[in-house]
């Protein structure tokens, strides 16, 4: 989702973590308000809600860009974090302030909740991954995708040849937020099982930004490569440090962060395009 916005449309955002939270909390509300509604439909609806929210926060992109747009999306990140904490209706007035996925069935299989199996949840996420990748590939190759890339490369020239910045930029924010919202719902209800507002903080926004930068802007395949590097390499470093050298887990936690940052710097120097 972030690569669609940043890599193809050239609009930077530091609010990815918060928009994932919008998707997660929206899905939670759909499941609690409509308990008989299929959870997969709730996930898609949460993506649509996030697309609408993303389009609203994308309005500043019509007047500003670059560093100033980054600051505007950072403000959206902090505002949404505040909303997740200060609006109890979003988490059904739970004392913990968190949201938790209930057990839901599909075709006789429990696909979410504490009683679901990890393999079942994996196949649900894999199905969404394949379908959304196919959709993104087709949209990017179409008229909408070409308008995003023209706005990214030279917005004034794009406007002169008939591309409307209003439509192109807001559609990029909406489409990107749709993907981010679905990923937030899948993360909470098909992986973590439960989450609090800390799961959607600014640190996660930076983490997703690093994935896109490492993988390469404007590359769908690069998104997956960047995600693998950011997620898998720290795990490997921790395991090697504990098993081979006997280092403490706390030491390896901090060492993995340092090495990941060093790796990002090296990749940006050697391969600036990812």
Question: What is each of the regions a protein language model found here?
Answer:
Residues 1-274:
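Transmembrane alpha-helices and adjacent helix-loop boundaries
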């Amino acid at each position: 989702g972030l690569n669609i916005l940043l890599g193809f449309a050239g609009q930077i955002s530091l609010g990815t973590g918060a928009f994932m939270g919008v998707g997660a909390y929206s899905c939670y509300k759909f499941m609690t308000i409509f308990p008989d509604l299929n959870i997969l439909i709730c996930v898609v609806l949460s993506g649509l809600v996030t697309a609408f929210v993303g389009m609203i926060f994308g309005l500043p992109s019509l007047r500003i860009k670059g560093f100033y747009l980054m600051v505007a999306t950072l403000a959206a990140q902090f505002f949404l974090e505040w909303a997740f904490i200060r609006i109890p209706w979003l988490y059904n007035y739970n004392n913990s302030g968190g949201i938790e996925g209930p057990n839901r069935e599909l075709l006789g299989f429990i696909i979410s909740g504490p009683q679901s199996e990890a393999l079942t949840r994996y196949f649900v996420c894999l199905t969404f991954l394949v379908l959304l990748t196919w959709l993104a590939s087709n949209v990017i190759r179409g008229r909408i995708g070409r308008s995003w890339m023209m706005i990214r490369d030279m917005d004034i020239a794009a406007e002169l040849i008939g591309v409307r910045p209003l439509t192109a930029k807001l559609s990029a924010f909406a489409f990107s937020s749709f993907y981010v919202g679905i990923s937030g719902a899948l993360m909470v209800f098909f992986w973590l099982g439960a989450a609090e507002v800390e799961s959607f903080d600014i640190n996660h926004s930076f983490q997703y930004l690093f994935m896109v930068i490492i993988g390469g802007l404007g590359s769908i395949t690069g998104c997956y490569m960047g995600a693998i590097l950011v997620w898998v390499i720290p795990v490997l470093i921790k395991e090697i440090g504990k098993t081979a050298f006997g280092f403490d887990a706390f030491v390896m936690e901090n060492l993995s962060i340092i090495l990941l940052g060093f790796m990002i710097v090296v990749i940006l120097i050697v391969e600036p395009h990812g």
